[in-house]
Structures are given as structure tokens and as C-alpha cells.
Amino acid sequence: QPLKKYLENNSSYLGICVGMQILSDWGYEDKTTRGLGIISGDIKKFKNKKLIIPHMGWNTINLNKDDTIITNSFDKKDFYFVHSYIFQNIKKSDVLAFTLYGQKFPSIVKKGNIYGVQFHPEKSHKHGLNLIKNYILKS
């Protein structure tokens, strides 16, 4: 509850991987679990049964739109992913970037001052470090 209260005050937040997923309404990993409900949507397993899960390795993000932290300089850059579940049923207006891995999924989400990234910027070399730097300097 302290995190939800903090986020409801439009405080600055950068959720990484599961830290992004907890922003959703519901998660369906082992059992149905209520999320924080900050960004509407659900966390579900990849739909494509032919994919190797977890999605692990480098993949490209594609910006829908940029803002002060997630700028055009990140478009078409590779970041490091390790996950089996993705944000689904999310409003397009809450998605800053998407990635393709058997299907299109949100890789960066935003609502107010709250950001979530499905990838691991701390493992993503210079692009990841630049994203973290932008977040620290501009949030």
C-alpha cells in the first residue's frame, strides 16, 4: 500500500520488468493477482506457443511517441529483455514504445510521472544507462 499511495500522488517512478508489471490492474502468472491499478491493463503470458519463453536477450524498441525522458534517440535501439509475461489490454495512449517478439507488446509505458520498462536498462549498455540518466535528470 505505501507504493500505491506514493504513485497516486503522481510521484516520479521508474518500474523495471516486474516493477512495470505491478502497475497493471491484474496479473495472471501462477494465480490471478491484483496489481496496483495505476495503468489499466493485464499481465499475461506471451500468446504465441512457438516462442522460446522466457524472451531473453537483445531486442529493439520502437517508439510510438517521445517525451522528455524517452526521446527519439532511443527509437530502434536494442535493449536487454528477460521476461515471460507482457502488458496486454492497455490503452494505446499509455504506451510509449513497443517491441516485437512473436507479437507486438508494450516495452515502455507511461502515465503522468510514472514510467515502466519491460527490459532491463541496467543491463542494456549505453542506451540503458542513457535512459536511466534521462530519468534521474528530468524526473
Model-based region annotation:
Residues 1-57:
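Cysteine-nucleophile active-site neighborhood
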